[in-house]
């Protein structure tokens, strides 16, 4: 992950502990198979699952996030005009941005917000690429959900950058991806 909040650094420095618990055989077999497929140990996979629960699933549920089929979201958003999509992004940011930041990370900073976005992207299984070149951070997110979703997310991120008073940033889009470029001074 490219950006880390203060809480992430604190958690990392706290060390580890051992714990023993029982897992049903069929579940453990699935975990072993998935770990083998990902070329990881079962321990690493279980730690990633627990971390994902603590850093995303648990706080996201409290913040009002749910799971939706990407195809369904694409169908719905493709019914809207560009103006309606922009209006939805504006209303959503205006009504939910601050609440979401506090519910997910108990702080309302740009770094904590971006940490949340990255956690959501990873948890949702979207492909992304991060570069840090010449004092600029670039995040490319491949949604594969069509032009209208790209327009929504690009607009959403522009509004987020405005909200956090991030200057020298740029959001671009293609039919299936959103590109966010931010100068290093803000990260």
Regions found by a protein language model. Give the residues of each.
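Generic solvent-exposed, charged/amphipathic alpha-helical segments
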Residues: 47, 114-118, 154-158, 162
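C-terminal edge-of-domain segments
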Residues: 172-187
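Short, hydrophobic/π-rich interface segment
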Residues: 123-174
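An N-terminal amphipathic alpha-helical segment
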Residues: 70-139
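Short Lys/Arg-rich basic patches
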Residues: 1-24, 35
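Short, basic amphipathic alpha-helical segments that act as recognition/interaction helices
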Residues: 30, 40-63
């Amino acid at each position: 992950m490219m950006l880390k909040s203060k809480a992430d650094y604190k958690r990392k420095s706290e060390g580890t502990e051992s714990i023993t618990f029982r897992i049903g055989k069929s579940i453990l077999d699935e975990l072993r198979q998935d770990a083998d497929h990902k070329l990881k140990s079962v321990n690493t996979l279980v730690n990633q699952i627990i971390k994902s629960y603590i850093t995303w699933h648990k706080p996201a549920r409290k913040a009002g996030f749910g799971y939706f089929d990407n195809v369904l979201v694409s169908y719905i958003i493709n019914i809207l005009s560009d103006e309606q999509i922009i209006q939805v992004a504006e209303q959503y940011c205006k009504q939910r941005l601050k609440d979401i930041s506090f519910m997910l990370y108990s702080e309302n900073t740009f770094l904590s917000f971006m940490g949340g976005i990255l956690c959501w992207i990873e948890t949702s299984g979207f492909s992304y690429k991060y570069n840090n070149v010449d004092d600029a951070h670039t995040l490319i997110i491949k949604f594969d959900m069509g032009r209208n979703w790209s327009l929504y997310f690009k607009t959403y991120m522009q509004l987020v950058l405005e909200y956090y008073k991030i200057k020298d940033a740029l959001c671009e889009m293609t039919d299936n991806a959103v590109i966010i470029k931010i100068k290093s001074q803000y990260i």
